[in-house]
Amino acid sequence: MKKTTYILLGMVMTGFIIIAVMAGLAYCFSQPAASRHWVLDKQQTTVALPSCSVFFLQPIHSHNDELLRGGRGRSRIYLERSDLAIMPVDADSGSLTFPLELKPYLSVVTQGDTCMVCLDLPDEVYRKYRLDQGGTLLAEFGHMELKLPAGVQQVDLNWENLQSELHSWQCDSLSLQSLSSVDLCRSHFEHLYLRQGRFTMDEVKVNHLWIDLDEVYDWKVQAESCEIGIEHLWGSQQHHCQIQRGECKEVRWNPVVEEASLTLSLQQSAHVHFPE
């Protein structure tokens, strides 16, 4: 063959090799993302919850905490297309409806007047989705329902990106904490404490609304349908808040430390009073 023919054949072979290598790399890099998407079956089950005053939805973790720490950092389970409806029941006990596939890993623990729902995934799940190497698992739990006795005074939701809705609640005092967002609707509280998360309110009546500005990322009130008496704001940092027109009748600022400050943006005429 001519020298030019050898050169052309070499270029063709090199091209094939480059294409094969790039295809292999693309396949390898796409595998972890595809294998880290956990879609649970839609079949559900229900477990009974004991009478309690405090309810905790504990963080998802493994029996072996070392599996949560890979060379690339701490692993996490992040929910998507997962929501929780929270409602009261006129009974001494409640219930949780969730995917049947999670039943072997879910337990209910009681300590005094506190009820804790714990989801402890086995080591096999972490290895299957390569979480022993670090990273994030996207999990789809679908729609779930949490029914709690009306006497519950505190609800902590510690599943990341769990979208929750609390409705038809009427009580003297309720404290809420979430790692994501909570929509409150058709409820009435004497005292409502928002300690962490994002919150929206629609058709809600609250005489005293307590908001921790250090931990509450945002809150929105549908002024046309809500009735809020006094908003008690507190924090230990520098905060900036906008009070919507008709959001509440009174705002009170309670700094936790001397260095804390609050800048308010008002959308209507107001009277500012400084106590002696």
Regions found by a protein language model. Name each.
Residues 1-177, 182-185, 194, 202, ...:
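Intrinsically disordered, low-complexity terminal regions
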Residues 189, 206:
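P-loop NTPase nucleotide-binding/switch module
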Residues 199:
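Short beta-strand segments in beta-sandwich/barrel cores
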